[in-house]
């Protein structure tokens, strides 16, 4: 896959959010009259597109009848040996930057604390957070 595209109400706030996850802006451009960029990190690439007159996104995580985009998933198997500790560190990082820049950052919204899940013959640690527009992001780490 080349990239996943995310529409955002505020591209500058979204860039700052994804930078805290380890992404960096690789290209900035416009699509028509809207601001856009590609960001690379966590072994993937995302595209952020600012929407001039945004409407609230559906609750893809909470509405079990919702059809469409559900979440992006990032494999942290190579990045950490302990997903709960990694997530706690991320929460602290967001808490600190929210103090310094309250207009740009909110405390990290955790949708699902780390839990173990068996999928096929593997056991994973899985956690979900929400991005700045409330879109669910999954972090997964293979344990075996």
Predicted regions mapped to residue ranges:
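Vicinal oxygen chelate
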Residues: 1-10, 28-30, 37-40, 59-144
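Core segments of cupin and vicinal oxygen chelate
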Residues: 7-46, 52
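A short, acidic/glycine-rich surface segment
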Residues: 34, 53-60, 113
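Residue-level marker of positions within ordered structural domains that often coincide
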Residues: 44, 77, 139
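Short, charged/polar, Gly/Pro-enriched secondary-structure boundary elements
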Residues: 44-47, 56-57, 134-135
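Acetyl-CoA-dependent GNAT
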Residues: 51-53, 142-143
